[in-house]
Amino acid sequence: QELSSSDKYRLVIGNICNLELVDKLIVDCDAVVNFAAESHVDRSIANAKPFLESNIDGVFSLLECVKKYEKKFLQISTDEVFGSLEKDSATEIFPFNPSSPYAATKASAEMLVNSYHITYGCDTIITRCTNNYGPRQFPEKLIPKVILLAEQNKKIPVYGSGKNLRDWIFVDDHCKAIHSVLKNGKSGQSYNISSNNEIDNVTIIKKILSIMGKSNNLIEFVEDRPGHDFRYSMNSNKLRNELGWIPKINFDEGIKNTIDWYLSNPQWRKDLSDQTFQHTPWT
């Protein structure tokens, strides 16, 4: 809504696999930043086909047009391409070890992007980020799902022991990192984006419940999902040292802001179905 009145903003609803549409849109732009993706791991386990279509075929469509019109291209990727790490944090040169169909499609997209840089000389950059949270996140993701279920005093499903570790970053910090890379990043390079804020799932859930004044009895441990990675962690020293980026929002501040936003914007979720909150779509 804030952008809708700007002559620099235009919303086009379409599919990145539509090469004809993508061609028309890219011809007049300065750069392409590809956020478009199927991203929910649970759904990739239930049906991987939409993930292959969006995350690989869609990237191919974008790259073909980027090559044709010689545009700058930034691919948004994920820490999940590195798989689960028992210790240490993945640098940009760590080997890929994706565990889920989702992660495999994102790793495939990265290799496709790199191939267009090497083979055709395309101006490409890749960023990988850890778990995002903040306002307007789709409620199939952990943090908004917990907030919305807790608000209704409904049970909150937690996979396995709930001790899986993720590094959490507030969405504003992620966006600022992307902007920094788009402006000053080196062509052909990749940059990890992380906040060094590892927290296990059940600790996050209990923190949210505490802030909302809800009981931990809402937590319901359920069967773990297939191939559930235990720990993701990335080293973002390259981004910090070369481009001077640092995250600004700590988790306590960010999670309170996030809870406040969801509770203050009930109209945003009025059309959500109960299916959004199902926890085992592969069964």
PLM features per residue range, with description:
Residues 1-132, 257, 262-265, 274-283:
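N-terminal Rossmann-like NAD(P)+-binding domain of SDR-like oxidoreductases, especially those catalyzing
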Residues 1-2, 25-27, 46-50, 87-91, ...:
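Short, glycine/charged-enriched secondary-structure capping and boundary segments
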Residues 108, 112, 116, 146, ...:
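Hydrophobic alpha-helix immediately C-terminal to the catalytic Tyr-X-X-X-Lys motif of short-chain
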Residues 10, 14, 144, 150-283:
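C-terminal substrate-binding subdomain of Rossmann-fold SDR/epimerase-dehydratase oxidoreductases
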Residues 74, 83-86, 121, 137, ...:
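Proline-centered turn/helix-capping motifs that create local helix->coil transitions or kinks
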Residues 21, 31, 50, 57, ...:
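Residue-level recognition of oxygen-bearing side chains
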Residues 62, 113, 146, 239-240:
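Structural element of the ATP-grasp superfamily
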Residues 94, 98-105, 135, 139-143, ...:
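The catalytic Tyr-centered alpha-helix of NAD(P)H-dependent dehydrogenases
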